[in-house]
């Protein structure tokens, strides 16, 4: 996968090409420093929020990032305010939403770090 950190502010679409929102930031796995989740801006212009989507299996297109999860699942994902960072205690819920295994980082530290 190309460096998805370069694709901030590009459209995020699902496997069917349906636009989900705009890639706002990338969270890396603290154990590998590899991109793990992206946050996508969704909602009405006056009520934007950021939802999390796994980047595993994502494909980069000319002006978009195609993720492997349906729009409906991404829109229902755990969300944070546009100026917030995911609290460590909420990380397990993000993984659980996508039925992904969660293990804390080394020494019980957080698993995801915003880049």
Go through the PLM ranges and name each one.
Residues 1-115:
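Peripheral interaction segments used for macromolecular assembly
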């Amino acid at each position: 996968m190309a460096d998805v950190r370069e694709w901030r502010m590009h459209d995020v679409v699902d496997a069917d090409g349906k636009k989900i929102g705009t890639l706002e930031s990338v969270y890396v796995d603290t154990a590998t420093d590899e991109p793990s989740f992206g946050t996508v801006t969704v909602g009405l212009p006056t009520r934007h929020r950021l939802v999390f989507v796994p980047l595993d299996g994502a494909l980069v297109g000319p002006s978009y990032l195609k993720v492997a999860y349906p729009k409906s699942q991404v829109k229902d994902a755990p969300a944070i305010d546009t100026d917030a960072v995911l609290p460590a205690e909420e990380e397990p819920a993000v993984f659980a939403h996508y039925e992904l295994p969660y293990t804390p980082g080394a020494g019980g530290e957080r698993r995801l770090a915003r880049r």
